[in-house]
């Protein structure tokens, strides 16, 4: 049952915003933390902005990760942070596997039989997770976010529109290598 559950969105970019939109349809209470997104932007969407990752994990039944892998975020989802989840907490990783400190998450899940972990990219320690946490761990074999025919078509259309926007108007909104 998702209705009435508290969902935490860790990073409120495009994917995080869409997760919030969908979760609202299930009647979830939505919280978000993003170190780079202004609170006003988050709250404009009817989402409760919090001041820290610690606050997000403490407040929410489910946390959905959308952070990129950077030097600062690598292994940042660790024992201390995930242990803040309330009893029965669920961590959903649709970000990158490198943000998870797998050894610490395994240790925590051994200590807390109430935690669940779901990820759409197979962790390096998949066999350990699968053997030790039956019914509390789920993984897909590879990053599945854009592996449908529709997603690939939409990605092609979006790329074409962005190229036209750049050539026609000089729009650099989606430029990757900003100077």
Task: Please tell me what each predicted stretch does.
Residues 1-3, 24, 83:
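Short, flexible hinge/linker loops that cap or flank conserved catalytic cores
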Residues 1-18:
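Glycine-rich NAD(P)-binding loop of Rossmann-like domains
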Residues 8, 31, 116-118:
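A structural signal for isolated positions on well-ordered beta-strands in alpha/beta enzyme cores
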Residues 20, 28-29:
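Residues at the starts of beta-strands that form the adenosine-phosphate
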Residues 26, 45-46, 133-136:
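Short, structured coil segments at secondary-structure junctions
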Residues 36-131:
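Rossmann-like adenosine-cofactor binding region
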Residues 116, 121-179:
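C-terminal helix-to-coil terminal segments
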